[in-house]
Amino acid sequence: MSAGYRKAMLESEIQKVLTEALRNFKGESEIDPTLVSIVRIELSKDKRYANIFVSYLGNDEEKKKAVEFMEENKGYFRTAVAKNIRLFKAPELRFHEDIGIEASLRISKILEEIKKQEQEKEENE
């Protein structure tokens, strides 16, 4: 149980460090780093790899650019993690686009359409 707790705490700390690193980013970028959100982090059991799911306030093309931005600056973010969190070795960071928000919106829209269709059927009968 304590190993799971430690993993969850490390994931939370990494999320905080990366959010702060995004806020303080000084390099050039096509996107605004302050609009990038770290949605969730999945740390591997051996803590060597961290899958980081990011979201960006913008269209699909901008979201892909946000993931590319994170990948291009992977060293900067890994250094931030290494400096701020006591670990034997900083995990390798792997960035992915988070589709959870879009998927939930799509599902709710589908459910609303089904509800409308059912109401129309009841009215017609």
From Swiss-Prot:
GO terms for molecular function: ribosomal small subunit binding. GO terms for biological process: maturation of SSU-rRNA. It is found in: Cytoplasm. GO terms for cellular component: cytosol. Pfam families: RBFA. Keywords: Cytoplasm, Ribosome biogenesis. NCBIfam families: rbfA (TIGR00082). Belongs to the RbfA family. Monomer. Binds 30S ribosomal subunits, but not 50S ribosomal subunits or 70S ribosomes. One of several proteins that assist in the late maturation steps of the functional core of the 30S ribosomal subunit. Associates with free 30S ribosomal subunits (but not with 30S subunits that are part of 70S ribosomes or polysomes). Required for efficient processing of 16S rRNA. May interact with the 5'-terminal helix region of 16S rRNA. HAMAP family: RbfA. This is Ribosome-binding factor A. It comes from Kosmotoga olearia (strain ATCC BAA-1733 / DSM 21960 / TBF 19.5.1).
